[in-house]
Amino acid sequence: SAASDVYKRQPIRQYPEPAFWRAPIDNDFGNKMPVLAGVWRTAHANRYVKKVTIGENNEKGLSVRVDWVLSDIQVPYTMEYLVRDNGTVIVTGSIDLTGTKLPELPRFGMRMELHQPYENLTYYGRGPFENYIDRYSGAFIGRYEDKVENQFYWYIRPQETGNKTDVRWLTLLDSGGLGVKITGLQPISFSALHFSPEDLDPVSYTHLR
C-alpha cells in the first residue's frame, strides 16, 4: 500500500532528542567524571512536556516550540522546529542552567536514530579520522566519504569514538541514494555509529574500567 511504502522509505526511527552524555574516555575515569557528572547520563530520558506553542505559518515557515522539564534535575529544556516550505526542518535546542549548581556538562547536543540501511556517509568537515575539539590539528577540512561501520575505532576498552569537528553538512544515504542531509547553521560536531552512548558505556561493566 502507499502508506506502507512511505513508512519503509522513512529514514528516521527516533527523532532528535537532547543529548548531554558521552561514553567516558580513559582520562575521564582519572578525573572521576563518570561519578561527578553522572547525573547527566540519564537527564535526557526523564522529561515531560510543559507547553507546546505553534506559531503562525509565514514566509519563514511554521514554527513549533516544545518546552520540556528535565525531571531528574528540574531544569527547563526547549526544542524549536521551523518547518519550511522546501521540506527542510530547522531544529534548535536550548537549556537554561541559570541558578543551578549542577556538575560539568559532558556534552550538549542532540541525538537521533535512523533505520539500518543508511550506511553511506558523506560530510564536509575535518577528517578522515576521528577528531575532537582538543585534538584536530592533523585532521584537515574537506569532503569525505565512508561507511558508517568504519566510524567506530576499536579501543581496548569501549569508549567515546568517531567524532568529527568543524562539519558544515553531512548526508546518510542508502544504496539507492535516499536518506537524510543535516546542515549546521554554524560548524558542528557529529558522530555516526551503529552504537549508542549506552552501548559504549554500560554502567554495569565496571570490570572493564
What residues fall within each predicted segment?
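Beta-strand/loop-rich accessory regions of lumenal/periplasmic or secreted enzymes
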Residues: 1-209
